[in-house]
């Protein structure tokens, strides 16, 4: 947990990693992000700009299914890479869209003042392996906390982000 600007072990301190995983699954499932706040500092377990923080009774993550069909979210833990440490997996099941095959969430730095920096996040939609559109999702602001120049590099196209985004060809969202 981040307490008064410092990392501190606490009960519930890892709950934001679960919220971040659910948030990214929601982005990939094309859910409307109703409420989401970033951390004070960028998280180390997800690209800058793609985190979500929660604090019971104060800060929440809220997403909305705007499709015409029900969605089902399954969460589970398993040792995906054999290192003995389980990872949180989130799968969202729903009706298969026809307009796109995959959504890849991205984020990039848009402003760096030295003490704070801001990012944009977006969904990149793919159909048959080709990018068909981008949709800006959120602007996040973080306190600088030792991030590298690479993490905070500002792309040539500040409004639309990096150009070299590729589909993952993975199925984080299940249809049927």
Where are these regions (language model features)?
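Well-ordered beta-sheet/strand-loop patches within structured domains
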Residues: 1-176
């Amino acid at each position: 947990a981040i307490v008064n600007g410092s990392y501190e072990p606490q009960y519930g301190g890892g709950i934001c990693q679960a919220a971040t995983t659910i948030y990214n699954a929601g982005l990939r499932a094309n859910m409307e992000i109703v409420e989401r706040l970033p951390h004070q500092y960028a998280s180390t377990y997800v690209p800058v700009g793609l985190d979500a923080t929660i604090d019971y009774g104060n800060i929440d993550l809220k997403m909305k299914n705007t499709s015409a069909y029900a969605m089902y979210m399954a969460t589970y833990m398993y040792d995906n890479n054999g290192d003995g440490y389980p990872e949180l997996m989130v799968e969202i099941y729903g009706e298969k869209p026809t307009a796109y095959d995959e959504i890849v969430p991205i984020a990039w730095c848009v402003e760096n003042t030295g003490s704070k920096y801001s990012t944009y996040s977006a969904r990149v939609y793919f159909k048959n392996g080709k990018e068909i559109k981008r949709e800006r999702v959120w602007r996040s602001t973080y306190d600088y906390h030792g991030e590298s120049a690479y993490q905070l590099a500002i792309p040539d196209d500040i409004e639309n982000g990096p150009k070299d985004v590729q589909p993952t060809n993975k199925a984080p969202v299940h249809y049927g």
